[in-house]
Amino acid sequence: MKPVLLTAAVVTASLLAACSAPVEAKPKAKAKNVILFIGDGMGISTVTAARIFDGQSKGMDGEEHELSFEKFDNLALIKTYNLDAQVPDSAGTASAMNTGIKTQIGKINVTANDNLGGCGDRSAPVKIADLAQAAGLSIGIISTARITHATPAAVYGHAADRGFENDTDLDKVAIKAGCTDLAAQLISSNANYVLGGGAKHFAKKREDGRDLTAEWSALSQDHVYVDNARQLRNLPATGKNVLGLFTKSHMAFEAGRDNNKEPSISEMTERAIQNLSARDTGYFLMVEGGRIDHAHHGTNAYRALTDTVAFADAVEMAVNTTDPEKTLILVTADHSHVFTIAGYPARGNPILGLVKKENGKTAKDADGKPYTTLGYQNGPNFRDADDDALTDKVVAGKNYLQQSGVHLESETHAGEDVALYATGPGSEAVQGVMDQTEIFGVITNALGLTSTD
């Protein structure tokens, strides 16, 4: 029996030793690609309303529905303030994400050392795109706004004034300093795949006489410019560096988009992924749903929600066409809006409709007038004597402007936190309450570009 007991003791000791030995942590997988989706102005109330709107369009009550990115594994709340502003603008918020540094309102990728009106290049911080290109990655930029607008411009440019989209926008100080406008900066940025609006800033409307679209095409045999959806579709999916500008200014809202002239945000995203993935170098792609913000500024909930749903569809397409082991996908907003969901409507009440009680009767305010579930704290459609004539058909129309509490020419941004949704390698860093500047570190660390240690 003794030999057997000795063997058992040895085995037991060996097992205990194995259990107490340190276990090597499995290294976290590095992302080959990162896609940053930014819903401009897509605050949490917008996500909620769009969720219900999309669900109701599919025959549900709506409240139980989920948009594509709401299924992601990781979630955080993001502080959005600018260096000098409690309620931010898109220039400051996009700069925070792209550089990890807060800027003053109205500035793109510059520090407080550059006053408005200067070039902004004396203190331009390093951008994600700079680090990515230095590491051999490709760069893609997609927006339904002008490609020189604040959010897309922050991927490739810097400006002490976000209004420097064209050389005609430069003030006397900027001209004297020899500043370069954002459209010209894009052409020299070495970006690989760029689609959006804003063609007017690249040719005929310029004082310097430059045709920047022709300059893009002249960069190499592989550089191509297109100006409508059919031209884009006729291009080979891979092998080209593409600049596509489909409208003079911003692209159309999704509710009025002509598919023969303008590709959808999903189609633009799909084409970008096909092109960038084929390079096999890895890529950083920023996709902006830029018109959500514009609809909110006009208190037009219908267009804000239809553009948000289109944006969510683009995210779903990206999830379905990328490798989840290699691609980090982030979805966030740059800021929120003073957009509310209120009034105790019954479950399943049309989100664009008048508030109805559980008994089906229309709710009335203290003056005996009906009111909508969706509204704005401020904006152009101040409540007036005509409110008692509102009907469900009127308020559900795509041109209806929601009621606002404070009369302003344009509705404003809001200062509350926005959400950040994440999936893929590196997404575990997205949790809790974070500053917007930390998105820079999430991306660069996932790609192995820098360390925040």
Q: What residue ranges belong to the model's regions?
A:
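Extracytoplasmic mature domains of secreted/periplasmic and thylakoid-lumen proteins
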Residues: 101-183, 190
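Bacterial N-terminal signal peptides that target proteins for export
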Residues: 1-8
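Active-site-adjacent structural elements in enzyme catalytic domains
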Residues: 29-36, 41, 45-46, 51, ...
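A post-motif C-terminal structural segment
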Residues: 31-33, 42-95, 148-453
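Structural beta-sheet core signal
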Residues: 36-37, 141, 331
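C-terminal motif of bacterial Sec signal peptides marking the signal peptidase cleavage site
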Residues: 17-18
